[in-house]
């Protein structure tokens, strides 16, 4: 790591800031202070109420006002699969499942029944995960106005801490569920990790995935699970984290009162994190899989990890900052080279982090995604770029851009400190509890970086990065598709690629500095010619002197966010499906625009230009409209306007860049043919859209047939008349600040003064009748995927939007209850209802992943439940669960900028599912829903079934 940088910078900084006072007062030499300072804990988030109970349990409680009236609850355990003995492989994860299947105060499934009756959704709000060294349970979006519910959720956490029932019957029923989870998750990436972990670790604790051995999962005696639970689920390994809109002091008292009585076991087993062995010679491992979506190379240079007790210090914080600067600069060079025709990789990047899955070993990592067959050459190219940086260092201009970028991030986080979501703040607290990571807070992060930034110079960084690429502790791993024409690179060429790059002598890098403006000369600003307000949506609409319209909605949901869209009628629906060339051009149109220059700036120059700016704008040719979308923080609103202006006025060809991006696209498409889910999704899209050529899946032949010049002209034509467009901005907008920018950059866009004549519409064809597509697919882990899509015409309004959503939610809950919990026929069966405003249709979607032996039963159950829904066969309990959840979620959505952006855009097309929505939802009765559902039927259903069969050996 870069620890020496930290010491040098802190010494320099403290000498500069403290030296005068120390000399005057005759105190100790300030140069002796940094190491002591480095070891002091970071205590920036003093507003977090935290403590350790006498039994060893830790707690962290934080008042947070966003989202309003909601709270998130977590119990984090420093417990995971590394604590299993060889007879318990998979039981840490199994125990996580059992926490939802009976506790002392909530027998059986009563916990989920109760929480769902109170608006909380299993999966979305109620969930958990198990890792190698941690298990975390969460209950999110709890309405804080419901005091009884808040107390009940605390009781759930208490039961998860010490009172999980582990009933034998429930254990046996859950075995099948976990077996289906294993089947569903055992894709090529999981198989790769299953193969690589025993090779790169000598320690058995890190040699298996947390889901474990299915032989053990299906056969372990109850006692093994209970032994693991009682041994490791104990207060000294547990942390309670609660973040939300509540009285933190009162919450702290409740936590102390409820969790203090939990007993800490006597003679508890020590919690040991296994150390990871070093290696003198390079470890090399290569793995091929017929379903692998791409070739990837991972190169790790292992390092000693910072001890846990030293991680919550200024020194550790400083180390993280310097690592971020280094990776930012190297990534910029890797990205810049990827834009060259001779580059053999599609993507490459570096990062510092845990060595694979272990917290006790750290690593500097280089990831490479080769394009074609020459894996060693792609690896060599990326390694040479990294080695050159480590050998010759960075330039002042590179470092300044990296510091500008990091400063911009710190500023944005600080600006959002009062509007950051519960989940984001909770994740920081969880990482602090489990890993002792720095808990400074955004204000201190920003203040510290402002103070030390000037001390972080190339003279400091360059000597230190020389030690990153070591001769020992190298680990090289290759993961690639198994297919004809692609061969494994082999140990010798890959080790040589790394070693030769490290030993090669390089010339210093010369950075191309961007000094010219994006826009050479701006025209005289236009004017706002008319203003009107929309009280219902809370918006202000401007008409500009060139005929363009602008809609502004000011919100306080996020302190430093502006979301943007501009749209004009058009899109795919205006392309004649019989015009093959135009259809082929659709396949690469958006890519062609993003490959092109804005003014004189190609992609590499644009990346440098945007350093230190939190802003993005992209082009989109959609189904029913065309235009731009983007976002910025407040300070970068001008840059966002410059980008908008440039798309409209100076979109210039870059055929070399397009050729590179086309090649990447073709490589990705060829690789995706290995993925069974690609075959499934292609079949689904083709069936749903009746093989409309504009909507069917892209092919290599189609994208290669696309004409770059024609596509660029097509895009320019869509932006030739600003009077066709409405520009929508939502966020923390100061109208007085934004209006001059609108007049300069939007009112001066090219315009014909009035909207263009409407283009001819060629409606996208949609399936009619009942269609079933069924096929077999060779798979390494055979499984069956089922997708059923039922739809019909409907009036588009708030009532329809609510009713179809609730119907889908009931169906989803029944799938979980019957197909997963009762029958164990699938791990995660799902259903949803949605309103398709564009086609004025309701949709009910069912998705199941199961196995060949149980597929008929699972499909039968799914269809029976769908028939019940359409017949209005819904119980009051089922209805109340989904209605309360919908109310809870809608209240949260109302404080989301993207929700309002979508609502305003829909209103432009005469679509209104907002007016009266909340009142209609609150007043909806079961009888209302049943009456509405009886108007639906199954006359239009597409079903796609892909059945896995074993691969031929």
What do the PLM-derived regions correspond to, one by one?
Residues 167, 264-268, 391-399, 654, ...:
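Flexible helix-coil linker/hinge segments at domain or subdomain boundaries
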């Amino acid at each position: 790591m870069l620890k020496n940088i930290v010491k040098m910078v802190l010494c320099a900084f403290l000498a500069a800031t403290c030296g005068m006072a120390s000399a005057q007062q005759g105190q100790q030499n300030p140069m002796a202070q940094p190491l002591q300072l480095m070891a002091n804990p970071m205590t920036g988030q003093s507003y977090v109420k935290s403590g350790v109970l006498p039994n060893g349990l830790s707690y962290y409680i934080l008042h947070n006002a966003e989202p309003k009236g909601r709270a998130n609850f977590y119990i984090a355990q420093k417990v995971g699969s590394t604590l299993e003995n060889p007879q318990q492989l998979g039981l840490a994860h199994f125990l996580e499942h059992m926490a939802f299947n009976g506790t002392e105060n909530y027998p059986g499934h009563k916990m989920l029944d109760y929480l769902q009756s109170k608006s909380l959704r299993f999966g979305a709000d109620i969930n958990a995960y198990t890792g190698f060294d941690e298990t975390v349970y969460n209950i999110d979006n709890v309405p804080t106005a419901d005091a009884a519910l808040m107390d009940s959720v605390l009781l759930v956490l208490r039961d998860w801490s010490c009172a999980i029932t582990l009933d034998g019957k429930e254990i046996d029923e859950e075995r099948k569920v976990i077996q289906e989870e294993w089947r569903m998750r055992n894709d090529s990436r999981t198989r790769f990790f299953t193969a690589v972990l025993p090779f790169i670790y000598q320690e058995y604790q890190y040699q298996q995935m947390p889901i474990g051995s299915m032989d053990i999962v299906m056969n372990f005696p109850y006692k093994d699970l209970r032994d693991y639970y009682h041994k490791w689920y104990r207060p000294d390994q547990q942390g309670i984290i609660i973040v939300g809109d509540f009285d933190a002091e009162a919450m702290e008292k409740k936590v102390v009162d409820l969790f203090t009585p939990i007993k800490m076991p006597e003679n508890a087993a020590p919690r040991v994190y296994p150390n990871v062995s070093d290696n003198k010679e390079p470890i090399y491992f290569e793995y091929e899989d017929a379903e692998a979506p791409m070739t990837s190379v991972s190169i790790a240079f292992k390092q000693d990890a910072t001890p846990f007790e030293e991680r919550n210090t200024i020194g550790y914080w400083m180390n993280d900052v310097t690592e971020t600067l280094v990776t930012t600069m190297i990534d910029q060079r890797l990205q810049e080279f990827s834009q060259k025709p001779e580059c053999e990789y599609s993507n490459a990047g570096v990062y510092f982090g845990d060595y694979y899955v272990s917290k006790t070993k750290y690593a500097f990592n280089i990831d490479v995604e080769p394009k074609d067959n020459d894996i060693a050459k792609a690896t060599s190219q990326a390694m040479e770029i990294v080695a050159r940086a480590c050998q010759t260092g960075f330039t002042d201009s590179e470092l300044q851009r990296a510091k500008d970028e990091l400063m911009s991030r710190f500023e944005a986080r600080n600006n959002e400190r009062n509007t950051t979501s519960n989940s984001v703040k909770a994740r920081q607290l969880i990482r602090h509890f489990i890993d002792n990571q720095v808990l400074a807070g955004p204000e201190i992060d920003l203040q510290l970086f402002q103070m030390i930034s000037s001390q972080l110079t190339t003279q400091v960084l360059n000597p230190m990065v020389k030690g990153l690429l070591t001769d020992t502790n190298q680990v090289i791993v290759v993961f690639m598709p198994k297919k004809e024409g692609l061969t494994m690179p082999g140990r010798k060429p890959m080790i040589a690629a790394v070693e030769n790059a490290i030993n090669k002598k390089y010339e210093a890098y010369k950075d191309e500095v961007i000094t010219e403006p994006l826009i050479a000369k701006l025209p005289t600003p236009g004017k706002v010619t008319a203003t009107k307000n929309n009280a219902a949506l809370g918006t202000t609409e401007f008409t500009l002197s060139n005929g363009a319209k602008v809609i502004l909605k000011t919100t306080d949901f996020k302190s430093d966010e502006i979301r943007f869209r501009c749209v004009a009628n058009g899109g795919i629906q205006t392309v004649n499906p019989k015009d093959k060339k135009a259809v082929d051009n659709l396949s690469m149109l958006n890519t062609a625009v993003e490959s092109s220059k804005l003014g004189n700036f190609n992609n590499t120059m644009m990346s440098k230009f945007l350093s230190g700016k939190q802003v993005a704008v992209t082009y989109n040719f959609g189904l029913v409209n065309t235009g731009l979308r983007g976002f910025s923080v407040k300070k970068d609103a001008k840059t966002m306007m410059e980008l908008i202006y440039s798309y409209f006025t100076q979109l210039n060809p870059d055929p070399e860049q397009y050729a590179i991006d086309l090649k990447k696209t073709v490589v990705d498409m060829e690789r995706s043919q290995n993925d069974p889910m690609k075959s499934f999704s292609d079949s689904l899209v083709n069936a749903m859209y009746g093989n409309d050529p504009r909507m069917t899946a892209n092919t290599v032949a189609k994208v290669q047939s696309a004409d770059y010049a024609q596509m660029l002209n097509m895009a320019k034509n869509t932006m030739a008349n600003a009077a066709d467009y409405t520009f929508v901005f939502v966020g923390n907008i100061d109208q007085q600040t934004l209006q001059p920018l609108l007049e300069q950059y939007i009112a001066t866009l090219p315009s014909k003064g009035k909207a263009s004549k409407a283009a001819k519409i060629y409606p996208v064809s949609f399936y009619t009748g009942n269609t079933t597509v069924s096929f077999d697919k060779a798979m390494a882990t055979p499984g069956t995927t089922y997708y059923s899509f039922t739809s019909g015409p409907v009036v588009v309004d708030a009532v329809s939007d609510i009713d179809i959503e609730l119907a889908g939610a009931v169906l989803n809950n029944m799938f979980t209850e019957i197909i997963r919990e009762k029958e164990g026929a699938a791990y995660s069966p799902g259903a949803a209802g949605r309103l398709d405003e564009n086609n004025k249709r309701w949709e009910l979607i069912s998705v199941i992943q199961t196995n060949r032996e149980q597929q008929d039963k699972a499909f039968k159950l799914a269809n029976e439940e769908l028939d019940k829904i359409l017949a209005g066969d819904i119980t009051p309990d089922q209805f109340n669960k989904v209605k309360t959840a919908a109310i809870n979620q809608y209240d949260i959505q109302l404080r989301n900028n993207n929700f309002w952006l979508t609502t305003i855009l829909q209103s432009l097309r005469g679509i209104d599912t907002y007016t009266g929505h909340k009142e209609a939802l609150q007043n909806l009765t079961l009888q209302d829903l049943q009456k509405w559902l009886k108007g639906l039927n199954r006359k239009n259903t597409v079903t796609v079934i892909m059945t896995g069969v074993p691969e031929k050996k």
